Amino acid sequence: RQRQMCIRDRSDRMLSLDFSERSLEVQRGVVMEEFKQRCLNQPYGDVGHLLRPLAYQKHPYQWPTIGKDLSHVANATLEEVKAFFFRFYAPNNAILAVTGNISFEEAVELTEKWFGTVPRREVPVRNLPQEPEQTEERRLTVERNVPLDSLFMAYHMCDHRHPDYYVFDILSDVLSNGRSSRLNQHLVQEKQLFSSIDAYISGSVDAGLFHIAGKPSAGVSLELAEAAVRDELDRLQQE
């Protein structure tokens, strides 16, 4: 019964979501507080807002999902929200993930039962401008009242559907997953140039970014820290 209620409730939201000024204000407050907590009120919280426009000049990935500015959330109107919902929220534009103590057959049966009556919508064809090849370095230095200096580097990589996507995923683990990873072993433990360092991928559908982020140890300049990271990347290419 609970499984049926779960799927039914989600289909009901897609079919006839309750829009009102009151519900919008409640959710607006939630998102604005999340924006403040994650992006404005903690050290390095706005790194994504600073890095994305450097990496993307044409592609919409230059916009953080939560918005570029708090005013974008504060000024959203009920009409805009409704238009967005009815443009994109449709069974022919959705992926339903079902996990738990339920068989495949039952999941299909319940999905067909509750989503089968939700009408299709004319979803616009996804045709986003592709990011042109980056031909020069883009760099930004920001001075803030933060506990430690931090270094953030990003390299363009393939999209999620490209076979090499999994190569980048494994590469990020080779560089920073665990104490024996290259960056941790060489730059944190042996040379003690960083107190912490991490490598990860963005996981984007379109061409994404390969990130390296670290906090240099006390007394280590950002220039020395960056040079050490580049040396490790060169070693990785040659070995």
Regions picked out by a protein language model, each given a short descriptive name:
Residues 57-58, 62, 90-91, 95-159, ...:
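An aromatic/glycine/proline-enriched structural segment found at the starts
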Residues 9, 26, 30, 46, ...:
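Extracytoplasmic/secreted proteins, especially bacterial periplasmic and envelope-associated proteins
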Residues 1-4, 8-14, 44-71, 93-99, ...:
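M16 family metallopeptidases and their MPP-like homologs
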Residues 18-36, 103, 122-136, 188, ...:
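Acidic/histidine-enriched alpha-helical segments
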Residues 1-45, 60, 70-93, 103, ...:
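Active-site-adjacent, His/Asp/Glu-enriched structural segments that form or flank metal-binding
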